[in-house]
């Protein structure tokens, strides 16, 4: 039986899903609205990969760690060029009080701290050239990857076809298959469709209720410096990446629903200020540089910071169903063979590989117990069900 799928969006999410499906026998067509793959948020020179925790949310922290551990192990086995990624560690600097609370939170969860992270003090921080009297988390498997190199590697497969400059404006079911139309009236048909276009879910009638906020992020970089720099990713108010591609990259700003595409001097100054606590000498160096390059892109984030990964409802059937019917999860009105993966926020390169691996298992009808637990957690329809006081149904769409 021929298996084919159209994937909208060729950033890290679309490319990862294409990779997993192509390697299980699917013919994949990637439809990208821009001139090339990895042109949006996945097009920065570097992506820092480390978990970002939330206090008092064990479920989120465990899901974050699960994604982080999967992603770093997976990338390490892909066969990327060694100059395109390094997992030598990553440090997040924390205030003393916050670090103590987080340590308690993590120790009471399902985290094997010794293998994954270590809470470190200022004596260790100073070994990494930082001017800190705070504490920090050292993620032993953290690091960075070249996003464009990773995406190109993932789609280098005979089962994957890439079509650029294809802006999809509509999705509808016609004659038992999905029909996609572009802005210039091209038509694509397939039995299966996956929407992986970050913050543009609202473009389509079928997914316009899946709200995300757009966060503008500006990064900056300068040419290699004449003095010693940290050898691993360091995160404080901003982040500083190790030397790569003859540049040092730092950032990033985080502006909600700000759609200015220009590199702004005010944001460059914010990024410089954010690294003062990481490396005083580099901070001083950036203050006097006349040419500091940069890039702007957007991240899509959900209200609860949990991504949308899975299936979506048939809106017409959903509106007709009663609450007691919707409470029966085996009666939920899912659309056949339409999937979404979006809302990863600033943790796209940590979340997306694991989430698309799970989504590929859903598409292949080959779900493990852990996959079902993850899809329960990322259910795209959770808000609509919770709004109807169906909190249990929202997080138990699969029986585990």
Task: Walk through the language-model features, giving the residues of each.
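C-terminal catalytic lobe of FAD-dependent flavoproteins
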Residues: 286-400
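Helix-loop-beta segment of a Rossmann-like dinucleotide-binding subdomain
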Residues: 55, 81-92, 118-157, 253-258, ...
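Dinucleotide-binding Rossmann-like beta1-alpha1 core, especially the glycine-rich loop
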Residues: 46-128
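Active-site substrate-recognition segment that forms the wall
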Residues: 6, 13-24, 33, 41-53, ...
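Short beta-strand to alpha-helix junction loop
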Residues: 56-67, 95-99, 137-153, 262-267, ...
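Helical element adjacent to the flavin cofactor pocket in flavoenzyme catalytic cores
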Residues: 137-184, 188, 192, 196-197
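Extreme N-terminal leader/targeting segments of oxidoreductases
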Residues: 1-5, 23, 397-398
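Conserved beta-strand positions in the Rossmann-like core of class I SAM-dependent methyltransferases
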Residues: 29
């Amino acid at each position: 039986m021929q298996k084919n799928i159209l994937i909208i969006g060729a950033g890290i999410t679309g490319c990862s899903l294409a990779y997993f499906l192509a390697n299980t026998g699917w013919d994949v067509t990637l439809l990208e609205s821009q001139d090339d793959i990895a042109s949006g948020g996945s097009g920065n020179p570097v992506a820092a990969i480390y978990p970002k925790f939330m206090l008092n949310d064990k479920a989120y922290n465990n899901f974050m760690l699960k994604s982080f551990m999967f992603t770093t192990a997976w990338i390490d086995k892909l066969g990327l060029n060694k100059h395109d990624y390094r997992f030598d560690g990553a440090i997040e600097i924390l205030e003393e009080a916050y670090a103590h609370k987080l340590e308690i939170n993590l120790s009471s969860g399902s985290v094997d701290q010794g293998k994954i992270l270590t809470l470190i003090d200022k004596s260790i921080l100073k070994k990494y050239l930082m001017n800190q009297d705070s504490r920090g988390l050292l993620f032993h498997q953290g690091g960075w990857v070249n996003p464009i190199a990773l995406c190109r590697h993932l789609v280098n497969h005979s089962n994957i076809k890439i079509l650029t400059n294809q802006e999809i404006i509509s999705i509808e079911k016609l004659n038992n298959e999905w029909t996609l139309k572009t802005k210039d009236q091209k038509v694509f048909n397939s039995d299966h469709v996956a929407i992986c276009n970050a913050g543009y879910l609202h473009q389509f009638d079928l997914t316009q209720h899946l709200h995300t906020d757009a966060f503008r992020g500006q990064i900056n970089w300068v040419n290699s410096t004449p003095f010693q720099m940290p050898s691993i990713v360091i995160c404080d108010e901003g982040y500083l990446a190790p030397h790569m591609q003859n540049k040092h990259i730092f950032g990033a700003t985080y502006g909600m629903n700000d759609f200015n595409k220009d590199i702004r001097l005010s944001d460059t100054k914010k990024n410089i200020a954010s690294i003062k606590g990481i490396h005083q000498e580099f901070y001083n160096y950036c203050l006097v540089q006349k040419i500091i390059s940069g890039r702007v892109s957007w991240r899509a984030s959900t209200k609860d910071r949990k991504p949308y990964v899975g299936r979506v409802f048939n809106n017409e059937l959903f509106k007709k169903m009663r609450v007691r019917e919707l409470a029966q999860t085996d009666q939920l009105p899912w659309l056949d063979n339409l999937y979404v993966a979006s809302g990863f926020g600033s943790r796209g390169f940590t979340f997306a590989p694991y989430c698309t691996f799970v989504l590929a298992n859903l598409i292949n009808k080959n779900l493990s117990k852990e996959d079902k637990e993850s899809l329960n957690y990322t259910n795209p329809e959770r808000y609509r069900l919770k709004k109807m006081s169906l909190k249990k149904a929202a997080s138990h769409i699969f029986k585990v």
